[in-house]
Each structure stands twice: as C-alpha cells, then as structure tokens.
C-alpha cells in the first residue's frame, strides 16, 4: 500500500471485501516503538457484522486492511479469527 497521511483515514467508510458495511474510522492506534499503525478505531455501522456494545467503538487490527482508496477495504473473511476489542477512552 502506498503511504498517506494518517489524518486522511479519519471518517473514511470501512467496507468488507465481501461487501459488508463495517463502519467509519474514528481514530488510529500507532505503535511508536516499531513505527507502525496497529489498529483502526471504528464506529460500527448499524448492521455491521462485527459485535458491538452500544455507543462504543471497536479496534480492528490494521493487518486486516487490504486497500485504502475512497474507502478502507478490510478482509472480512478473517474478522472472526482476530481479536476485536472495545476501544478504551
């Protein structure tokens, strides 16, 4: 994937590679020690396939991202194989 400023990710829609609407990017989690983006903080869409707690965002591992253009595309076939946590604030 090509490089882009992190601020361009905010409020982008997230779509699964099978067509599901996942949600919107609200924040990012960056590991300064290794210099990598670790997770996307996501506000789940109403009918998103990810489990959600009312009013709480979730963290989706960045390794699921397959493309970033006008939307962020994630590998939704592996959503149930990764640890999706509730974002702490």
UniProtKB/Swiss-Prot annotation:
Annotated signal sequence range: none
Disulphide bridges: none
PANTHER family the record matches: PRC-BARREL DOMAIN PROTEIN, PRC-BARREL DOMAIN-CONTAINING PROTEIN
Organism domain of life: Archaea
Gene3D superfamilies assigned to the protein according to its UniProt record, in alphabetical order: PRC-barrel domain (2.30.30.240)
A Pfam family of this chain: PRC
Name of the molecule in the record: Uncharacterized protein MJ1118
